[in-house]
Amino acid sequence: MDEILNTINSPRDLKKLSLPEMTQLANEIRQLLVKSVAKCGGHLASNLGVVELSLALHTVFDSPEDKIIWDVGHQAYVHKILTGRREQMSTLRQYGGISGFPKVEESEYDAFNTGHSSTSISAALGMALARDLQGQSNSVVAVIGDGALTAGMAFEALNHAGQEDSDLIVVLNDNEMSISKNVGAMSAYLNRLRTDPSYSRTKEEIESVLNRIPGIGPNLARAAGKFKDTVKYLMVPGIIFEELGFTYIGPVNGHDLAELKAVLSNIKKMKGPILLHTITQKGKGYEPAFQKPDIFHGVGPFDVDTGTQLKKSLKTYTEIFGDFMLNQAQRDNKLVAITAAMTSGTGLSEFSRNFPERFFDVGICEQHAVTLAAGMASSGLRPVVAVYSTFLQRAYDQIVHDVALQKLPVIFAIDRAGLVGEDGPTHHGAFDFSYLRHIPNLIIMAPADENELVDMLHSAFSMEGPVAIRYPRGVGEGVRIKSERQLLEPGQSRLIAEGQDLAIIAVGRGVSIARDVVDLLAGKGVNPLLVDARFVKPLDRRVIAGAAQKYHRLLTIEDNSLAGGFGSAIGEMLVEEGIDAELLHIALPDEFVEHGRVELLFEQLNMNPDSILESIAGKWPELFSAGSRWELLKFGQN
């Protein structure tokens, strides 16, 4: 079944294959992709769309000497298969297995770590300039999608690359047909001419190129003489790239191996910055993904025969947010929703269909999204910016300068906060408390369950100034959402359990963990107070200060980085209040956390209930009886 694929252990093995063998290899790779993602979850549709492109790149170029940088990196599975990681695909995105994104620590063939969008051209240009300064001659290739090309950073890099005139190849993987549909015989003929080294084509030479097109060429050339600028813009679909200093080539059929190899071979010999525009189809070769590429962009485990995903019984926080937005929009005609190319991921698909005039998908432009919201808020609207925690980092200055400084009522719905699991360190939302907490005028909340999320969203519309609500990926706690909404006052915490031995102050996902810790402590004869803080800023200073003064032992639990997070805020507050109390902070460590199931990651980080119990016993052994201490000691040694 995989008779060719099993012989491919490095890109060198591709160079001896015939075209029919490579076509068969493409089919075998697609079968492995479907099998692997069905088991492990991941990005399927985009990888099915770049099989031929990946094969052609690794056949023409000599990786790892030649550098190939995959923008975002979610489409690099084929690259991994071709570079010695075929046997590890069964561990894709699993703890201890291979990453779902390029990772320099994983392989010498991964030239640059990616995970966020639109960084590839900047990184590739940096490598090209470093190569030039060091007198080297290797090729540098950036592979970027049409969606990623919407980001300002990509255009900044294109602009700079055109000025530098260094040898750099940018492959535009257009899998949405959003830039050009001009694929056909005439385009193929032009591509052959454009990439033939005997034609050093310039804008001034376009007439000679037109003359070589069979049949219609001379007439077009005569028209070009009369309408030079018009013809230039009509005949060169990538004129924007030409004006930026790139030689534009394309569109090329991204599934035609022979064409791709021929064009790339010629491009490799050309000088200066080159942009190759390829047209690919997401989901190619697997019908469910081909028919619904958006569903199979990022997908959980599924049944290969039907494409049906394994369903979860509870609603996700994302779905609950989406439901709230639909209901709120019916009551408040000033509500508008903004997202940065994450309509489905942030739960706004139904909103976009029901309220298209009040929905704005700005593309991969988080900075613009935030300042767009600021402009709307300054003019009387109530914008909600729905964004992943890890991507909101990209708009930090806009949050500070354009929103918070002016106290504008923008609501940030921050999805995928804390650990997100299998997507790993580039996607964990580990830092939002830390990078938001010190911004003046900003209120920050984190729900412990589904009902609390709805209460916080409801309350945000009554608060003055900007509000950030961060919530985790995945399903909720199974709490019933009440029909009556509670209007929360800024800083208002919730007492969950009275106690007498120590105080536990938790927030967000930390509350669920804290509940389990309380149960474990009760089994050891320890009775703690448990408070759901709800707010990271402002803190409920009265409740927290009172607990510290009464118990003198304070345990904080959060799923944010320890540095600058919720626990740090409490420590700072106690110093300000002059309260002497012993603190134990449970939070994410000062390191980038690997990929894997969230529950397993918490266990590895000693943030699961059993590990926290051990930490409490180590910090305050006097809370436990002699027998309990001995049991905990033995447990910790096992």
Curated annotation (Swiss-Prot):
Cofactor comment text: Binds 1 Mg(2+) ion per subunit.
Enzyme class: transferase
Catalyzed chemical reaction(s): D-glyceraldehyde 3-phosphate + pyruvate + H(+) = 1-deoxy-D-xylulose 5-phosphate + CO2
GO molecular function, one term: 1-deoxy-D-xylulose-5-phosphate synthase activity
InterPro entries reported for this sequence: Dxylulose-5-P_synthase (IPR005477), THDP-binding (IPR029061), Transketo_C/PFOR_II (IPR009014), Transketolase-like_Pyr-bd (IPR005475), Transketolase_BS (IPR020826), Transketolase_C (IPR033248), Transketolase_CS (IPR049557)
Record: residues binding thiamine diphosphate: 74, 115-117, 147-148, 175, 286, 366
Annotated metabolic or biological route of this protein: Metabolic intermediate biosynthesis; 1-deoxy-D-xylulose 5-phosphate biosynthesis; 1-deoxy-D-xylulose 5-phosphate from D-glyceraldehyde 3-phosphate and pyruvate: step 1/1
Entries under SMART domains matching the protein: Transket_pyr
Keyword Nucleotide-binding part of the UniProt annotation: no
Cofactor(s) annotated in UniProt: Mg(2+); thiamine diphosphate
UniProt key word Transferase: yes
Binding site for Mg(2+): 146, 175
E.C. number(s) listed in UniProt: 2.2.1.7
Keywords: Isoprene biosynthesis, Magnesium, Metal-binding, Thiamine biosynthesis, Thiamine pyrophosphate, Transferase
CC per GO annotation: cytosol
GO biological process: 1-deoxy-D-xylulose 5-phosphate biosynthetic process; isopentenyl diphosphate biosynthetic process, methylerythritol 4-phosphate pathway; terpenoid biosynthetic process; thiamine biosynthetic process
Transmembrane regions: none
PANTHER family named in the record: 1-D-DEOXYXYLULOSE 5-PHOSPHATE SYNTHASE-RELATED, 1-DEOXY-D-XYLULOSE-5-PHOSPHATE SYNTHASE, CHLOROPLASTIC
NCBIfam families: dxs, PRK05444.2-2
Subunit structure, as described in the record: Homodimer.
The family this protein is said to belong to: Belongs to the transketolase family. DXPS subfamily.
Cited function: Catalyzes the acyloin condensation reaction between C atoms 2 and 3 of pyruvate and glyceraldehyde 3-phosphate to yield 1-deoxy-D-xylulose-5-phosphate (DXP).
Name of this protein: 1-deoxy-D-xylulose-5-phosphate synthase
Organism: Syntrophomonas wolfei subsp. wolfei (strain DSM 2245B / Goettingen)
Lineage: Bacteria, Bacillati, Bacillota, Clostridia, Eubacteriales
